Design a protein with these regions (language model features):
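Generic helix N-cap/helix-start motif at coil->alpha-helix transitions
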Residues: 2-8
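Non-catalytic C-terminal accessory modules of carbohydrate-active enzymes
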Residues: 5, 13-139
Length: 139
C-alpha cells in the first residue's frame, strides 16, 4: 500500500483527523524512521528528504492539529499517551509562533518585537495572543 515514502505521513495526519490514533502513531513512526529502518529498501541511495518534510507535517498538522481556517490559526492537538510534550515553531505573517503542546494544555507565544496581537482558535474557542507573552490554554 505504501510504495512511496511520502504516503505514511499523510496517513498519519488523516489517522488523527478521523480518530484512528493507533494507526496515526504507526504511520508517523514509519515516516520518521524510513531511512533508519530502510523501510523502502533503498537508503543506500540517499536519504528521503521529502519524507523528512512529511514527518514534520505529521508533527505540526497531525499531532499539533494546526490548520488555517478563515485566515486564522487553529489548533486541535492530540498527543500519544507516552509523549510528555511536543514543541514547534511556525512563521505567521512575518512573526514566529512558538507552540508547546502538553497532555492537558497548550502554551502559545507570539515572538515579535512589535506590539501586536493575533487571534488563534484552539478546539473551536478563540484566544488573543499578545507579542512577547506566553498564553497557556487548558484543554
Amino acid at each position: 500500500m505504501h510504495k512511496s515514502s511520502l504516503s505514511p505521513c499523510i496517513h498519519s495526519i488523516m489517522g488523527i483527523e478521523i480518530g484512528d490514533t493507533t494507526k496515526a502513531v504507526q504511520y508517523f513512526l514509519r515516516s520518521a524512521l524510513v531511512d533508519l529502518h530502510d523501510n523502502q529498501g533503498n537508503t543506500e541511495c540517499g536519504m528521503h528528504a521529502a519524507s523528512a518534510g512529511g514527518t514534520w507535517m505529521s508533527v505540526v498538522f497531525g499531532f499539533g492539529g494546526f490548520r488555517v481556517k478563515n485566515n486564522k490559526m487553529t489548533f486541535k492537538p492530540w498527543l500519544p499517551e507516552e509523549w510528555k510534550e511536543l514543541q514547534f515553531k511556525l512563521k505567521w505573517r512575518g512573526d514566529d509562533l512558538k507552540v508547546t503542546i502538553r497532555p492537558n494544555e497548550g502554551v502559545f507565544a507570539l515572538l515579535s518585537d512589535n506590539q501586536k496581537t493575533e487571534e488563534i482558535v484552539v478546539f473551536d474557542k478563540s484566544y488573543q495572543l499578545e507579542s512577547g507573552k506566553e498564553t497557556t490554554i487548558p484543554f
